[in-house]
UniProtKB/Swiss-Prot annotation:
The name this protein goes by in its record: Vesicle-associated membrane protein 5
Intracellular or extracellular location(s): Cell membrane; Endomembrane system; Golgi apparatus, trans-Golgi network membrane
Paired cysteines (S-S): none
Organism: Rattus norvegicus (Rat)
Gene3D superfamilies (alphabetical): 1.20.5.110
A single GO BP: Golgi to plasma membrane protein transport
Length: 102
């Protein structure tokens, strides 16, 4: 009877050892996955920083481009109005030659 009890205890100890070894393997596997996940998160952080910098630069370039276009449009409108004003002045203001006729 003591021999059977000893065998049962030995089997239980072997089972516990096997379970512990499986758990240890799972812990090592999980550690590897966590390391890989940490590397990926670091890469994503670097990529997001680069993306943020690029978007800020692009937004600033577009802002200046918009301002430049508005200035050119304003100058074109002012030039057009000036041209219209000159044409109207030439047409409607009497010239010196017309006033000397009897």
């Amino acid at each position: 009877m003591a021999g059977k009890e000893l065998e049962r205890c030995q089997r239980q100890a072997d089972q516990v050892t096997e379970i512990m070894l499986n758990n240890f393997d799972k812990v090592l596997e999980r550690d590897g996955k966590l390391s890989e996940l940490q590397q990926r998160s670091d890469q994503l952080l670097d990529m997001s920083s680069a993306f943020s910098k690029t978007t800020k630069t692009l937004a600033q370039q577009k802002r200046w481009e918009n301002i430049r276009c508005r200035v050119y449009l304003g100058l074109a409108v002012a030039g057009g109005l000036l041209l219209i004003l000159v044409v109207l002045l030439v047409i409607f203001l009497p010239s010196g030659e017309d006033s000397s006729k009897p």
